[in-house]
Design a protein with these regions (language model features):
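Protease-labile, long low-complexity intrinsically disordered regions enriched in Pro/Ser/Thr
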Residues: 23-151
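N-terminal Sec-pathway targeting helices
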Residues: 1-22
């Protein structure tokens, strides 16, 4: 009888933290899977340093083309693009490249003190209205960490 109680107590002690973890972290894990979006592949002119500005929901602009499963976001030499496509909601693993002709060089978005080249992403709502919705502006900085800090 004592063995059954000891076993029951051990199961309770081990399972309690697991159950608490499921109740606390479970909704966040489920949210990650429910709010995925198609990833974007950003093509930035080779050597460009500065703010990238992508304006979405622009009535007279073309939609974003696709490259496999990616939305292809090719910005001009001034770091801008206007598209009639909507800014997708959710999370995805976006890719960032410098491009020149047909060659591409991957840019790291590793983060602080890790050699990253993509910084400070922001989403703004703009006053111009398309189909009853304001346009959206996505901005991020391309350059070294030092360049971003001096922006």
């Amino acid at each position: 009888m004592a063995r059954v109680r000891a076993g029951s107590i051990a199961v309770f002690v081990v399972s309690l933290p697991v159950l608490v973890g499921i109740f606390i972290y479970g909704p966040f894990v489920v949210d990650l899977f429910l709010h995925r979006r198609p990833p974007s592949r950003f093509l930035i002119p080779a050597g460009y340093v500065g703010w990238i500005r992508v304006e979405y929901r622009v009535a007279d602009a073309p939609p974003l083309p696709r490259e496999g499963t990616y939305s292809l976001v090719r910005v001009d030499r001034g770091g801008a693009l206007r598209t009639s496509s909507d800014l997708p909601e959710g999370w995805a693993h976006d890719q960032f490249f410098y491009y020149a002709g047909n060659s591409r060089q991957a840019l790291s978005n590793a983060g602080w003190c890790k050699g990253g080249m993509v910084w400070g992403e922001e989403i703004e709502t703009k006053a111009s209205v398309h189909a009853g919705q304001p346009s959206l502006l996505q901005k991020f900085f391309v350059g070294s960490e030092d360049q971003f800090r001096r922006k």
